């Protein structure tokens, strides 16, 4: 998922 810990900037933005 793009909200996962791999892409925290995705979930943050």
Swiss-Prot record:
GO biological-process terms attached to the record: one-carbon metabolic process
Catalytic activity, EC: 3.13.2.1
Domain of life assignment: Eukaryota
MF terms (GO), sorted A to Z: adenosylhomocysteinase activity
Record keywords: Hydrolase, NAD, One-carbon metabolism
The protein's required cofactors: NAD(+)
Summary of the function given for this chain in its UniProt record: Adenosylhomocysteine is a competitive inhibitor of S-adenosyl-L-methionine-dependent methyl transferase reactions; therefore adenosylhomocysteinase may play a key role in the control of methylations via regulation of the intracellular concentration of adenosylhomocysteine.
Name under which the protein is recorded: Adenosylhomocysteinase 1
